[in-house]
Amino acid sequence: MKQRGGFLGGQLLIAMPGMNDKRFIRSVIYICAHSDAGAMGIILNQLHHIGFPELLLHLGVINSGQKKDLSEPIKKFPVRYGGPVDPSRGFVLHSDDYACEETVLVADKICFTATIDILKAISCEKGPQHALIALGYAGWKAGQLEAEISTNGWLISSTSPSFLFESDLNRKYDESLIRMGINPTYLVSEMGHA
């Protein structure tokens, strides 16, 4: 297993109310990698229109006859819209009880894998105990994320595996603010600098 993450790796980005890019309004993003070359993360609180069985069919992991054999939890497994970059590519954030050669340890107990094998394992209920599947990712070139943070585009917060994998998708934005001690109704879109 590889280890990566960087300064912001394993942290949450929470969009400020003044976020100008409509793709990221009220977004909560888990940063998987951050370095001088840029950053990449997965949006946690946006569902993708494609379901997990359809994704498995599209990737050739199963055929149409095998779709009916999937368990109910697997049929209902949500797929997230991970971001606008590489939107047809799958990414899995997961607990550290699953690893292959391509798995990257992002933070304590949180890994990242982008292979067909992990999707096969999840579909057979032999994958990690906790997983979040996304299509696409959010990416920033060198210095771009830092510039957005300095102009109050994002809040930065720590997270936990339970928040990442178990909290309600529709409440993730408000919950992430509350965990920071911020009442979402009082958060304003404009901030000053001292």
UniProtKB/Swiss-Prot annotation:
Gene3D superfamilies: VC0467-like (3.40.1740.10). It holds the Pfam family DUF179. InterPro entries: AlgH-like. One of its GO terms (cellular component) is cytosol. Belongs to the UPF0301 (AlgH) family. PANTHER family: UNCHARACTERIZED PROTEIN YQGE, UPF0301 PROTEIN YQGE. This is UPF0301 protein BH04450.
